[in-house]
Structures are given as structure tokens and as C-alpha cells.
Curated annotation (Swiss-Prot):
Residues 31-423 are extracellular. GO terms for cellular component: cell surface; endoplasmic reticulum membrane; extracellular region; GABA-ergic synapse; glutamatergic synapse; Golgi apparatus; Golgi membrane; Golgi-associated vesicle membrane. This is Chondroitin sulfate proteoglycan 5. Residues 371-413 form the EGF-like domain. GO terms for biological process: cytoskeleton organization; glial cell projection elongation; modulation of chemical synaptic transmission; positive regulation of substrate adhesion-dependent cell spreading; regulation of synaptic vesicle exocytosis. Residues 442-460 are annotated as: Interaction with GOPC. The gene is Cspg5. InterPro entries: CSPG5_S_attach_dom (IPR010555), Neural_ProG_Cyt (IPR009505). It is a single-pass type I membrane protein. May function as a growth and differentiation factor involved in neuritogenesis. May induce ERBB3 activation. The modification Phosphoserine is found at S467, S475, S483, S543.
Length: 566
């Protein structure tokens, strides 16, 4: 729209419209964010346009008002001529007015693919005309070639300071567009990228890993990266040998290098008593079995099989094995030494090795010859024992004899000292003495009880009166005390209380309980009781003599009967 009235002041567009125009341009997607610049640059342009309003109005008032039909300025796409403006408005003012109204003039130089954008300089309405998009071929060509210098480069940046109202345009330099921005703005497909000439094409990260590395972990490619054993099925062709030949070493040679010959492997047990002597013997063995024997032994350990077959296929490896201490030494399987039978087995007198050769009992094959066990192993007999070879038996150990020390076992491994023998002897004697003491105490106690009981009975008989002795026809010494029964002379007589007649109470009841009128039955129960206490009734069965020759014929008859029974 034109300004109403020729002499009225030229008021610029309100700030709200400017902000709205900038927002529409940014959100419409006409220009990529990388070409349009950051939001900070947009805000700077808005501020500069607001500052320009007052200055532009003043200059226009001084220069005079142009005609209504001449106040419209149109800006076309890159490469078009600047439209004619009024005579009172300079090119710098027209440029700044267009940039303030549309906010797209500074975008036109950066975006080579934008179409023409027209806007009215004096109106507050910004109209963006549809852009003329480039063809795909043109866009491709423009992306690989630097853009040409536009005719109206004044719109690419803020205006330069003018002298006498004339813009001073500096030298126009071509602007370099980064590779990331070289995209077709109007096309739907991305621009293909071509590598530079003279440089190798980079591969994805997944192609960097060598495939042979995984083949080495496979069972089919076993040994591909480990030097490629001769004749192995998993030899990799992608890793040729630089010297032109494959390594000649095998897995068995590797084991032989890592496990050198050691004389200590042959010792079944280690003596804990003669350490210094063993060290000297080991030095002698190393002198006798030197480096030449080691080389011969390694030659014997080489297998006579195909190089492709390794120990991993179930075949035994030729390595030295430790011999258990409970066995006597002979031949070891897989090498030049094996086990032999114990000396107690005379039937098994020969031991054969893997090479088919045989040695006698007590000899072992070492470095192609049969050697004695006693010579090969000086510490075969422990604790200073002497080793001898006996026919059909083998090695025999004669144990060393010392004062109060004895050795025993097949190889003199057990020790018996005088302290052990003394402990056994003292323990046995103490046990026997303890048993004898217990028996003596037991019988002594029994005898003491019997003696005490007899003494009490003698005292009671010594203090009896003649009347008590007349009634004491059945006195016994082993009657227990504890009751005071009444004693009767005969079963038909009444009971008479007597403190000294307790011994007859038990027998009195036995005799008289069956038949009180049968005194002849007294002898039957007395015989059984008197036989049990025969040894204790010898002294007490006879009553003392009556004083003064007095006595009754009946009492004498009872005493005679009692003596006859005893």
C-alpha cells in the first residue's frame, strides 16, 4: 500500500508485524536453519530495523515525499536487478526498508537455491511469493561448484556507512558454502556425496575386524592363527608365510621345551632325615646324567606319527609322571621308566617297556640301557638303609641299626625309638598292676567282713549264763540280727522272752510251724542249713562245760546230737 497523502510522515511497520514476519520465515522452512543463521542474528536484524525507522522517516521528510505509485520497491531473486525507487529514497534506504519489512533480504545471498522474494517497501504487509526452485541437475551442479557472485550482494549484510548519502560498496567476495549445506532445497531426495579423487574409500566399522580371527576360534579353523601346524586342516590361506615356508615345530616339541628333564621327577618320595645327603646325591646324578642324555631322551620322546595329528585327538603326550610313594619303581608308561611289581610278587619278574625291550627285576631302562634301581636312585631306601638286589625279588632294603632305634618297612620308612618301646612296656606293666590291686582290695574286704562277724559271735557266747546255754541247742554264727522273737524250748512249751536267744528264733519257727507235737522233725531242716555254714559252726557248735559237774541228761543228749551232725 502507498502512503496516504503526499506530505504525511512515513511511519514504519509496527514491531509486532516484524516479529511475526521473522517467525513465519523461520517456521515455513523455506531456508534451512544453517543458512538462515541463529536466532541471535535474527534478533539483531530486528533491532537494527527498529533503529532504522526513525532515521529513515527523518531522511524521507527532508528529501520530500515521492509519488504514490513510485513508493513500491520490489526485490527479486539472486541475479535480478534492483527495482526503481523514488528519487527521494537512496539505494541504502530502500535496501534497509526492504530488509526491515520482509526480513528475508539477508537470507537471499546465503541461500543460492531460493526463489525470488518480493515485498512492498512502504507497506506493513509482507508477501512472500512462491520461489522458483532449481532443477535437480542444476542443484547438483551448484552443490559441487562454488556459487557465482550475485549482482545484488548489498543485501547479504548490513549496509556500509555512506558518505554524502551514497552507499560505499566494498569488493564483493564469493562466499564459501560448507559441505553440510550443499543440499538441494527444493528436491525430495538427498544429494549424493562423492569421495574425493586420490583418497581411498572408507569402509564401515564392521569390515575392520578380520574374518580369520573368528576362524581361529572355530573348530574347523583350529590352529589358523597359531603358526599353522604342518598339514592341519584349519590352515588359513589369507595369512601366507612371509618366508615362504611354514613353521616346522609341532605341539609335542612345545611340550618338550616347556618340560625339561629333571632328575627329581623320578624320586617317589623325599627323605626328611637326610637332606644334606640327598643334595650331594642329586649333584652326582646330574653329573652322571648330563646334557647328552637329555638330548638323547628328547630324541626318544619324538613321536613317529603324522605331523597333523596332535595330542588333542586322544593320543597320550610323552611327559614325565610322578610315581606314587607306595609303589616301588620300575618302568613308567610313555617313557623309558615304568612300574614293576612289588618284591612280594616273585611271579612277575619282568617288566616290558613300549619299545619291546625287557629288563630283569630290579633294573629299569634308562637311555637305552638297563640300570639298577639302587644305582639310579641312591635314596631308594630311607633312613640310611642299604639297597641290595635279590634275584626274582628285586630291590631289597636292609635297614640301619642304631642304639635304641629300629627301622621297619619295605623301604625303611618307619622308625621305632626307645621312647616308644619304653612307653609300651610301662603302660603294659601299669595295667597289670592295676588289675592286681583291684583284685587284692576286693578279696581283702570280703575277708575283713567275715572276720568281724565271727568276732561278734564269740563275744556273745562268752557271756552266756547256764540257763541260756541250756536253751541254746541250735546256736549258729551267721544269723542276722534285727528281731527279738520269743524262744521256746519245745514246740508245746510257752514262749520265753530271752535277749540272748535271738539266733534260735528263725529255726524255732521253722521247726514248730508244721507240727508242734513232732520233735523228731528238727533234724531235717537243720541239715540243710548246717551244711551251708559248716565252716563257721565248728567252734560255736560245742557248748562250754557246765560248772561243778551239774547238768541234765537231756542237755548232754542234745549236745551229742549236735556234734554228730557237724
Amino acid at each position: 500500500m502507498g502512503r496516504a497523502g503526499g506530505g504525511g510522515p512515513d511511519w514504519g511497520p509496527p514491531p509486532v508485524l516484524l516479529l511475526l514476519g521473522v517467525t513465519l520465515v523461520l517456521t515455513a522452512g523455506a531456508v534451512p536453519a544453517r543458512e538462515t543463521g541463529s536466532a541471535i542474528e535474527a534478533e539483531e536484524l530486528v533491532r537494527s530495523s527498529l533503529a532504522w525507522e526513525s532515521r529513515a522517516n527523518d531522511t524521507r521528510e527532508e528529501a520530500g515525499l515521492p509519488a504514490a505509485g513510485e513508493d513500491e520497491t520490489s526485490w527479486t531473486e539472486r541475479g535480478s536487478e534492483m527495482a526503481a525507487v523514488g528519487p527521494g529514497v537512496g539505494p541504502e534506504e530502500a535496501l534497509e526498508a526492504s530488509a526491515a519489512v520482509t526480513g528475508t533480504a539477508w537470507l537471499e545471498a546465503d541461500g543460492p537455491g531460493l526463489g525470488g522474494v518480493t515485498a512492498e517497501a512502504g507497506s506493513g504487509d509482507a508477501q512472500t511469493l512462491p520461489a522458483t526452485l532449481q532443477a535437480p541437475d542444476e542443484a547438483l551442479g551448484s552443490s559441487t561448484m562454488p556459487p557465482a557472485i550475485p549482482e545484488a550482494t548489498e543485501t547479504s549484510g548490513p549496509p556500509s556507512p555512506a558518505v554524502h548519502d551514497k552507499p560505499s560498496v566494498g569488493p564483493e567476495l564469493p562466499k564459501e558454502i560448507p559441505l553440510e549445506v550443499r543440499l538441494n532445497l527444493g528436491g525430495s531426495t538427498p544429494e549424493p556425496t562423492f569421495p574425493l579423487q586420490g583418497t581411498l574409500e572408507t569402509q564401515p566399522a564392521s569390515d575392520i575386524i578380520d574374518i580369520d580371527y573368528f576362524e581361529g576360534l572355530d573348530s574347523e579353523g583350529r590352529g589358523a592363527d597359531m603358526g599353522s601346524f604342518p598339514g592341519s586342516p584349519g590352515t588359513s590361506e589369507n595369512h601366507p608365510d612371509t618366508e615362504g615356508e611354514t613353521p616346522s615345530w609341532s605341539l609335542l616339541d612345545l611340550y618338550d621345551d616347556f618340560t625339561p628333564f629333571d632328575e627329581s621327577d623320578f624320586y617317589p618320595t623325599t627323605s626328611f632325615y637326610d637332606d644334606l645327603e640327598e643334595e650331594e646325591e642329586e649333584e652326582e646324578d646330574k653329573d652322571t646324567v648330563g646334557g647328552g642324555d637329555l638330548e638323547d631322551e628328547n630324541d626318544l620322546l619324538l613321536p613317529s606319527q603324522k605331523p597333523g595329528v596332535g595330542p588333542g585327538t586322544g593320543q597320550p603326550t610323552n611327559r614325565w609322571h610322578a610315581v606314587p610313594p607306595q609303589h616301588t619303581l620300575g618302568m613308567v608308561p610313555g617313557s623309558s621308566i615304568s612300574l614293576r611289581p612289588r618284591p612280594g610278587d616273585p611271579g612277575k619278574d619282568l617288566a616290558s617297556g613300549e619299545n619291546g625291550t625287557e629288563c630283569r627285576v630290579g633294573f629299569v631302562r634308562h637311555n637305552g640301557s638297563c640300570r639298577s634301581v639302587c644305582d639310579l636312585f641312591p635314596s631308594y631306601c630311607h633312613n640310611g638303609g642299604q639297597c641290595y638286589l635279590v634275584e626274582n625279588i628285586g630291590a631289597f632294603c636292609r635297614c640301619n641299626t642304631q642304639d635304641y632305634i629300629w627301622h621297619k618297612g619295605m623301604r625303611c620308612e618307619s622308625i621305632i625309638t626307645d621312647f616308644q618301646v619304653m612307653c609300651v612296656a610301662v603302660g603294659s606293666a601299669a595295667l597289670v598292676l592295676l588289675l592286681l590291686f583291684m583284685m587284692t582290695v576286693f578279696f581283702a574286704k570280703k575277708l575283713y567282713l567275715l572276720k568281724t562277724e565271727n568276732t561278734k559271735l564269740r563275744r556273745t557266747n562268752k557271756f552266756r549264763t547256764p540257763s541260756e546255754l541250756h536253751n541254746d541247742n541250735f546256736s549258729l554264727s551267721t544269723i542276722a540280727e534285727g528281731s527279738h522273737p520269743n524262744v521256746r524250748k519245745f514246740c508245746d512249751t510257752p514262749r520265753v522272752s530271752s535277749p540272748h536267744a535271738r539266733a534260735l528264733a528263725h529255726y524255732d519257727n521253722i521247726v514248730c510251724q508244721d507240727d508242734p507235737s513232732a520233735p523228731h522233725k528238727i533234724q531235717d531242716p537243720l541239715k540243710s542249713r548246717l551244711k551251708e555254714e559248716e565252716s563257721f559252726n565248728i567252734q560255736n557248735s560245742m557248748s562250754p562245760k557246765l560248772e561243778g559237774g551239774k547238768g541234765d541228761q537231756d542237755d548232754l543228749g542234745v549236745n551229742c546230737l549236735q556234734n554228730n551232725l557237724t
